Amino acid sequence: MHLLVYLSLFFALALASVTEISLDNKHRHRHEQQGHHDSAKHGHQKDKQQQEQIKNDEGKLTKEEKILSEENSDFSVNLFNQLSTESKRSPRKNIFFSPISISAAFYMLALGAKSETHQQILKGLSFNKKKLSESQVHEAFKRLIEDSNNPMKAHQFTIGNALFVEQTVNILKGFEENVKHYYQAGVFPMNFKDPDNAKKQLNNYVKDKTHGVIQEMIRELDSNTEMVLVNYVLYKGEWANNFNPTLTQKSLFSVDKNTNVTVQMMNRLGLYRTYQDDDCKIIELPYKNDTAMLLVVPQLGKIQELVLTSKLINHWYESLATSIVDLYMPTFSISGKVVLKDTLRKMGISDIFTDKADLTGISEQIKLKVSMASHNAVLNVNEFGTEAVGATSAQASPTKLFPPFLIDSPFLVMIYSRTLGSQLFMGKVMDPTNAQ
């Protein structure tokens, strides 16, 4: 008997849909009449308000949440660096994942892990018992999940958990109570001896919880399955300050020194926080909430050499300064699939996937192990109505009036919540036209 963990297609599908909201006809007509620079001038007051909100959002975390944020940051960069190393075999492969959802799922599993299995999970997640107790970590995740799922919050970030257990298996009451208390995880009996019907029920559950975004989370189920762990993350962000779709045009993007692809390049003149040094240039794009996207553009050909650290990311954030920028960035849609079983083994979390696994904190009735763990995340950065707008075939030409910020080569993307103090998503965009 084994534990089947579907951290796939929905611990799995982290949908970060970044859409530009259309103006009503009256405002949109006036916006287009006034032109690019005039509209940017009128938008500066809104930009300034957004910059003030950024300052207000930061620094509201509790001591425990700040420590958890640091640990999640360490885990995030470790996982990113491991995935980046693995991707060198496919230099045009994009990377995208949700570190906080992976952390939540494995901390939840840690509630039922014991001995070396338990220690490996905590160490792999960068847990430091000298700074925080394990119970404090679970409490911090409890607050994070409650906050993220609060319908009164401006952000649209939702974490959900569910455990589907073979109806003949006795799950320890303490474990069931803990996952409900800390991770809002529902525990549901399931007849996995009828895998087709079980698959249908699981997919319907996820379809309902994700408002139809995910139609088919699970394609196959083994009749020997004893438990399925579902961890899903949904995120939808709207730019705090919109791009004008009529300014989008076709432009070239350099995948490497020898390869160019054609992309749809958006353009906006406005106030942004930016930073530049000899290695890269960075810009922060705020959403209509407490989150922001950070784009890091290394020199062409240098992205594969970049090794992230928490210290380096903190340096970037602390160095950001506000200025008027003429921004050119591509629309893109990428997905990233991570075979966690292979990647986490390389990061020290290995026993849980073998017969050495000790998950007797979940059930003492049978010997459990994690037989499958994968993670899919999808990011869409686009404009409303782009397909309906006739795009001209021309190279982007930044204005000379303000400093241009042109994103036309591979870049890193991070989506960060200031009030949650966490990296929600991380990725590397090598080719914006490669959706896989």
From Swiss-Prot:
GO terms for cellular component: extracellular space. Keywords: Glycoprotein, Secreted, Signal. Residues 1-16 form the signal peptide. Gene3D superfamilies: Alpha-1-antitrypsin, domain 1, Antithrombin, subunit I, domain 2, Serpins superfamily. Coiled coil: none annotated. It is found in: Secreted, Extracellular space. Induction: By estrogen. Residues 26-60 are annotated as: Disordered. It holds the Pfam family Serpin. One of its GO terms (molecular function) is serine-type endopeptidase inhibitor activity. InterPro entries: Serpin_CS, Serpin_dom, Serpin_fam, Serpin_sf, Serpin_sf_1, Serpin_sf_2. PANTHER family: SERINE PROTEASE INHIBITOR A6, SERINE PROTEASE INHIBITOR, SERPIN. This is Serine protease inhibitor A6. It comes from Xenopus laevis (African clawed frog).
